[in-house]
Design a protein with these regions (language model features):
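Active-site/ligand-binding neighborhood in enzyme catalytic cores
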Residues: 90-92, 99-236, 240-247
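Mid-domain catalytic core of redox enzymes
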Residues: 24, 224, 230-357
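Dinucleotide-binding Rossmann-like beta1-alpha1 core, especially the glycine-rich loop
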Residues: 47-123
Length: 390
């Protein structure tokens, strides 16, 4: 069978595009090199709990069209992201708000909190003498002062990036939201939640009635026995591209853009994360879905307790066990999963060169975080796929 589209990657971009293409009467084959569908939003069921295998994914958006779209497929729960920071055993609410300031300084009013922050910011401004911040440390100090920076930003950021804050560019932190209200809701968006039953339910709905194949590496497509038999190729296929366009008229690619071009201009840099996940014999390990560990003495950046994404109140205790994941940030090495683009001057310039190559590829659409070398929240990925021409 020849398809209208071969879609490489079954994450939110690929799955949403496939859904729209099917609605438009197009035929699609979605392939994924992993043994499952869903990309990084895939959930693994453990002890009756949907475990976010590739890290916490909390859906939030101000885009009502996107919110209505996902809710037309699956209902979402009322989960609200309210992380907590642990600094040497001291607990602070996030994002930075009046609860945080009360915990830091014992202040009770917005005016007291503003005065404390302005006092510390003024000290930094005087130190800089009117010059622009030269690095992330100076930028953060100028934005929020020394106490917040040293307890809640400095060491956490250094663990995330693997570098001293003095060696990180200032543009990484353009602004730091500070709220002078008692509100622990991390996001300002109008809509927020988790699909009831987990993200697999959403992916299954998006890909319903669409041909899919897992454990299928796009770059080895021309060697895949199933693909070869599907094509009934009389002679060996010369390349993955030849196989792709033997299968379909058009290609949607959601993998790393540099890999598509065989790294001919050089490799783009990424940050990645790894997880150590375990079952705990307690119904409630930490009392919150996400706790950030903001000091160097703890090697991981945060602990995720997956149960709290979907269980509330007494239902937390209905299951006597829980599942937690320690998240570790690390430098990307070939063979690891790329997570976050490193948007410094070198990588931005290189990405632009790859985008120019991509624009010249006939009948190939590049979309999503990896293929565009951009950090996207989930709603933006879906919005992009909804607006792409079929």
């Amino acid at each position: 069978m020849r398809y209208d589209y071969l879609i490489v990657g079954s994450g939110l971009f690929g799955a949403t595009f496939a859904y729209r293409a099917k609605q438009a009467g197009k035929t699609c084959l979605v392939i994924d090199k992993r043994p499952h569908l869903g990309g990084n939003v895939y959930c693994e069921k453990t002890e009756g709990i949907n475990v976010h295998k590739y890290g916490a994914h909390i859906f939030h958006t101000n885009n009502k069209e996107v919110w209505d779209f996902v809710n037309s497929l699956v209902p979402f729960n009322r989960y609200t992201n309210s992380p907590v920071a642990n600094y040497h055993g001291e607990l602070y609410n996030l994002p930075f708000n009046m609860n945080t300031f009360a915990q830091l300084w014992g202040v009770r009013t917005p005016d007291e909190a503003k005065a404390k922050i302005e006092e510390q910011r003024a000290d930094v401004a005087a130190m800089l003498g009117g010059s622009e911040p030269r690095n992330l440390e100076e930028q953060a100090l100028l934005l929020v002062g020394r106490d917040i920076y040293e307890k809640l930003i400095k060491e956490y950021t250094e663990k995330q990036w693997g570098r001293d804050c003095k060696d990180l560019p200032a543009f990484i932190i353009k602004r730091l939201p500070v709220r002078f209200v008692f509100d622990n809701n991390y996001f300002n968006d109008a809509f927020q939640g988790i699909p009831i039953g987990g993200y697999n339910v959403l992916i299954d709905k998006l890909l319903e009635g669409i041909d899919t194949r897992t454990n299928c590496d796009f770059f080895n497509l021309h060697y895949d026995p199933f693909i070869i038999s599907t094509l009934s190729a009389a002679s060996p296929l010369a390349s993955f591209k030849q196989a792709a366009f033997a299968l379909a008229d058009k290609l949607v690619y959601t993998g790393p853009i540099d890999e598509y071009f065989d790294f001919r201009l050089g490799r783009l840099d990424w940050r990645t994360v790894t997880f150590k996940t375990r079952i705990e014999d307690t119904p409630n390990y930490q009392g919150n879905a996400v706790i950030n560990y903001t000091s160097h003495d703890v090697p991981y950046t945060r602990v995720i307790e997956h149960k709290h994404f979907e269980s509330f109140g007494q239902s937390v205790y209905d299951n006597p066990k829980t599942v937690i994941s320690e998240e570790y940030s690390t430098e990307f090495q070939p063979g690891m999963e790329p997570y976050y683009p490193v948007n410094d001057d070198r990588n931005n310039s290189l990405a632009d060169q790859y985008r120019a190559l991509a624009a010249a590829e006939p009948n190939v659409h590049f979309g999503g975080r990896l293929a565009e070398y951009k950090y996207y929240d989930m709603d933006k990925v879906i919005e992009r796929a909804l607006n792409m021409e079929i």
